[in-house]
A protein has these predicted regions:
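Membrane-helix boundary connector in multi-pass membrane proteins
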Residues: 112-113, 130-152
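Alpha-helical transmembrane segments of polytopic membrane proteins
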Residues: 10, 44-60, 112-130, 152-155
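Canonical alpha-helical transmembrane segments
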Residues: 54-77, 130-138
């Protein structure tokens, strides 16, 4: 298969994932029409965005896996991918420690606000990065990148699980 055909196949897969996510969100919007959607439009919009990201993230695993299969013969790609995945997983660990760290003396600082926004975004996307690392680890052609990708998967999963348990524990009634 030619390189252009491979790129076209992967691009078509991502377009299909986008179309599927858009269709699911459209069906969800149609199913939840009513006064609540009108009155609480911003909250419904945020929920629709999260639904889109979730469906697209899951559907995009297929073209992502296909692209990785096409890139299997290139060891330098796998070296860079696995090291980058480890670095990115380390940012999840850093975010976790910033989340559980004690509050600063000035609670309304701009740095804390930006850190909270970045931490929330990082937490929401963490399962998708973990799943992507797992798919890459399964497809990896050699042992070294596979192990690095599995470590990145474990870091992403453990950080997301810890944050989720922290949220559940804090919401629990006394």
């Amino acid at each position: 298969m030619r390189a252009l055909a491979k790129v076209g196949l992967v691009a078509a897969g991502y377009l299909g994932a986008f179309a599927l996510a858009s269709a699911v969100v459209a069906v969800h919007i149609a199913a939840t029409r009513g006064a609540d959607r009108q009155q609480y439009g911003a909250m419904f919009s945020f929920g629709d965005d999260l639904l889109f990201v979730a469906v697209f993230g899951l559907a995009a695993i297929i073209p992502f896996g296909i692209a990785l299969v096409f890139l299997r013969p290139y060891p330098s790609f796998w070296r860079v991918l696995s090291v980058t995945a480890l670095f990115f997983a380390a940012t999840a660990v850093a975010m976790f420690f910033s989340y559980v760290a004690p509050e600063p003396s000035e609670p309304h600082s701009a740095a804390k606000a930006w850190l909270a926004v970045a931490g929330l975004l990082r937490t929401v996307l963490s399962p998708f990065f973990g799943l992507a690392c797992l798919v890459a680890a399964v497809i990896a052609p050699s042992r070294s990148p596979r192990l690095r990708l599995l470590v990145a998967t474990a870091l992403e999963g453990s950080v997301f699980g810890s944050i989720a348990l922290t949220w559940l524990y804090r919401v629990r009634p006394p």
